[in-house]
């Protein structure tokens, strides 16, 4: 099963189980959780079921394409269901069956691993899912998002698409993954991975990035004052990515790191609160629609 087929199979599987199949969000981010389809929709009482592919950038993870299992740019397949279905583990195992992985034929373990995103003020309890000794998925029951208690609790399922594809195709490097039957992952991304690593670790200008962070933070604050939820979130995400680039460049001390994370978390909290207030003013329309449908 090539990489495209893995995505198509998961899209069909979760669509058949009531999920909106959304698209990735068009700004740099370190995780699929940062997409407003998850970060914002996990807040408040309204039900929400969504699935989507999210390209992620984690500058510090880059290894110039030389590490077979580690890139600074990669893909997550994200599922969020609110409220969490009682049979969510069974649904997940069925999704593996749809990919041709029979759980009864493999060593599948749910290993306790609570998750946290300090910059988003988000955390939850959950597990890593290990398939024959390799982590392929993260399960998280959200307790907070934007430092706001999640009621009801959402379940987030994050598949590592590259790891899944490597397992299914029995290859030992990301670059060897068949994206289609005649194009590899390396054909598509290896050169870009090398160049982005050169930028992240060598060519980026720390002064420029520090200035960018300050400008993005200033813009986020004035947008929050104007009560513009999504534009505000855009600039919070830009702050986060600028910080990650500075971190990769090695120019932020331990003390500064904590302070920068706190500044981003404070902005994320304000955006989350603003979103909740906005939905409340609208009388939580999706909650009403669900009650009428029932």
UniProtKB/Swiss-Prot annotation:
PANTHER family: GLYCINE--TRNA LIGASE, CHLOROPLASTIC_MITOCHONDRIAL 2, GLYCYL-TRNA SYNTHETASE
Annotated protein name in UniProt: Glycine--tRNA ligase alpha subunit
One CC-aspect GO term: cytosol
Species classification: Bacteria, Bacillati, Cyanobacteriota, Cyanophyceae, Oscillatoriophycideae
Description of how the protein assembles with itself and partners: Tetramer of two alpha and two beta subunits.
Primary location group: cytoplasm
Keywords, comma-separated and alphabetical: Aminoacyl-tRNA synthetase, ATP-binding, Cytoplasm, Ligase, Nucleotide-binding, Protein biosynthesis
Enzyme class label: ligase
GO terms (BP aspect): glycyl-tRNA aminoacylation
InterPro entries: aa-tRNA-synth_II/BPL/LPL, Gly-tRNA-synth_heterodimer, Gly-tRNA_ligase_asu
């Amino acid at each position: 099963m090539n990489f495209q087929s893995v995505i198509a199979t998961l899209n069909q599987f979760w669509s058949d189980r009531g999920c909106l199949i959304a698209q990735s969000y068009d700004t740099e981010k370190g995780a699929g959780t940062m997409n407003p389809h998850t970060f914002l929709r996990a807040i408040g009482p309204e039900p929400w079921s969504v699935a989507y592919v999210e390209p992620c950038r984690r500058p510090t993870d880059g290894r110039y394409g030389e590490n077979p299992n580690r890139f600074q740019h990669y893909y997550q397949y994200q599922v969020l269901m609110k409220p969490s279905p009682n049979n969510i583990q069974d649904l997940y195992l069925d999704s593996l069956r749809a990919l041709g992985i029979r759980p009864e034929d493999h060593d599948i373990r749910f290993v306790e691993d609570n998750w946290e995103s300090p910059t988003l003020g988000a955390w939850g309890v959950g597990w890593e899912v290990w398939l024959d000794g390799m982590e392929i998925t993260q399960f998280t029951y959200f307790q907070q998002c934007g430092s706001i208690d999640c009621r009801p609790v959402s379940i987030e399922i994050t598949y590592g698409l590259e790891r899944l594809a490597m397992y299914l195709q029995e290859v030992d490097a990301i670059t060897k993954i068949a994206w289609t039957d005649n194009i590899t992952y390396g054909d598509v991304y290896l050169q870009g991975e090398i160049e982005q690593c050169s930028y992240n670790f060598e060519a980026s200008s720390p002064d420029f990035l520090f200035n960018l962070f300050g400008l993005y933070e200033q813009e986020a604050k004035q947008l929050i004052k104007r009560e513009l939820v999504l534009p505000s979130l855009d600039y919070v995400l830009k702050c986060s990515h600028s910080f990650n680039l500075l971190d990769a460049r090695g120019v932020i001390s331990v003390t500064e790191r904590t302070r920068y994370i706190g500044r981003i978390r404070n902005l994320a909290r304000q955006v989350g609160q603003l979103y909740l207030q906005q939905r409340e003013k609208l009388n939580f329309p999706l909650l009403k629609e669900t009650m009428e449908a029932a």
